[in-house]
Amino acid sequence: MYRIYSALIEMIAASVFIIPIWCIYNKLRFRSWKLTAVYMVFGFYLSAVLALVGFPNIISLKIELTVNIIPFIHMIHDAVNACLNVLLFIPFGFFLPVLWKEFRSAKTLCIAGFAVTSFIEIAQIFTGRTTDIDDIIVNVAGALIGYLIAYCFTNAFTRRIVKDAKLSDFYIVCASVAFIMFFFQPFISSLLWEVVL
């Protein structure tokens, strides 16, 4: 429960930057408030994911190389955490094919899930946490489940919520959220924690 509460605080802190930046994007690039609103929701979700997995930030960098490359070891010993990681990436697998036609195949969706979760795991070298192959496996599994859920909603799958969503927007949203979470969000987050504690 505390982790969810913590992720909510971190997401609110990120939204202080996401909302105005996305509004600027809307003016310069997206040119659709509907599209911008959907991207904001996706951005909030990504910020919560990064907060939950312990994404590094400029305030608390700690380089420590701890790697597990043997699959299924930690998964077996900590099944609850493995299940939570699966749940964490289900929305990722749902968002992508609904928003972007490029992710309508399971293969491209899994590649995207693998790329994003690998980036997160490599980034954890700078947090002192363990970079774990099991996390990559369960996160991709969660993304695939989300994809299958989206596939069941044939109307949403065959007709995107926003038809003018471009693949380049996916990279912009992901890179912007990672940039915000690393450089700016920690300062607002520390202020919020002082208020709530």
Residue ranges and their predicted role:
Residues 1-122, 126-127, 151-197:
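Bulky hydrophobic segments
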Residues 130-132:
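Membrane-interface catalytic loops of GT-C/OST-like multi-pass glycosylation enzymes that act
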